[in-house]
Amino acid sequence: MQNKRDSYNRDDLLASSQGELFGPGYPQLPAPNMLMMDRVTKMSETEGDFGKGLILAELDITPDLWFFDCHFPGDPVMPGCLGLDAMWQLVGFFLGWVGGKGKGRALGVGEVKFTGQILPTAKKVTYEIHMKRVVNRKLVMGLADGRVCVDGKEIYVAKDLKVGLFQDTSSF
């Protein structure tokens, strides 16, 4: 694997969406508009609540982001499912970062709670992912807890985020 660092900028994340950051066969992030972060500010294999890995990332909020026009007209708010998807994206990114290969797929979440919202007036969303477990067998899978904050206030909490890496997704 190439480019294993402890932080990544927007250009790096765009390279990941094209399969060019870690190399052929490693999981890719989605391309814009579904790429839900502008930078990864910290990657660690040993930190986090469980000592199994920590990912910190950020998304800059501007009123012209695509989802504010359609969700909802006259009442713009970032869809909560996009914040949840961002957490899955980061778990998959971590799996590639630690050497896992395959196509990333979200497998589920044990529990998710939304206690706030992301409005066009916000400045920054931060994501915090605490890896609980990485299984590296025939199926590479990550299990993590995550939280989303807007301008420093926690608004989403997810438990048991699951992402798998698949060599063949035809039967998935």
UniProtKB/Swiss-Prot annotation:
Instruction: Write out the catalytic residues in the record.
Output: H71
Pfam families named among the record's database cross-references: FabA (PF07977)
Chemical reaction(s) catalysed: a (3R)-hydroxyacyl-[ACP] = a (2E)-enoyl-[ACP] + H2O; (3R)-hydroxydecanoyl-[ACP] = (2E)-decenoyl-[ACP] + H2O; (2E)-decenoyl-[ACP] = (3Z)-decenoyl-[ACP]
What's a GO biological-process term for it?
unsaturated fatty acid biosynthetic process
Q: What EC number(s) does the entry state?
A: 4.2.1.59, 5.3.3.14
GO annotations of cellular component type = cytoplasm
Q: What main location does UniProt list? A: cytoplasm
Keyword Lipid metabolism among record annotations: yes
Compartments where located: Cytoplasm
List the coiled-coil residues. Answer: none
Which molecular function GO terms apply here?
Answer: (3R)-hydroxyacyl-[acyl-carrier-protein] dehydratase activity; trans-2-decenoyl-acyl-carrier-protein isomerase activity
Name its pathway: Lipid metabolism; fatty acid biosynthesis
Q: Which UniProt keywords apply?
A: Cytoplasm, Fatty acid biosynthesis, Fatty acid metabolism, Isomerase, Lipid biosynthesis, Lipid metabolism, Lyase
The protein's matches in HAMAP family, at most eight in alphabetical order, are given as: FabA
The job of this chain, per UniProt, is described as: Necessary for the introduction of cis unsaturation into fatty acids. Catalyzes the dehydration of (3R)-3-hydroxydecanoyl-ACP to E-(2)-decenoyl-ACP and then its isomerization to Z-(3)-decenoyl-ACP. Can catalyze the dehydratase reaction for beta-hydroxyacyl-ACPs with saturated chain lengths up to 16:0, being most active on intermediate chain length.
Sequence similarity: Belongs to the thioester dehydratase family. FabA subfamily.
Subunit structure and binding partners: Homodimer.
Q: What is this protein called?
A: 3-hydroxydecanoyl-[acyl-carrier-protein] dehydratase
Organism source for this protein? Vibrio parahaemolyticus serotype O3:K6 (strain RIMD 2210633)
| Source taxonomy | Bacteria, Pseudomonadati, Pseudomonadota, Gammaproteobacteria, Vibrionales
Gene name tied to this protein: fabA
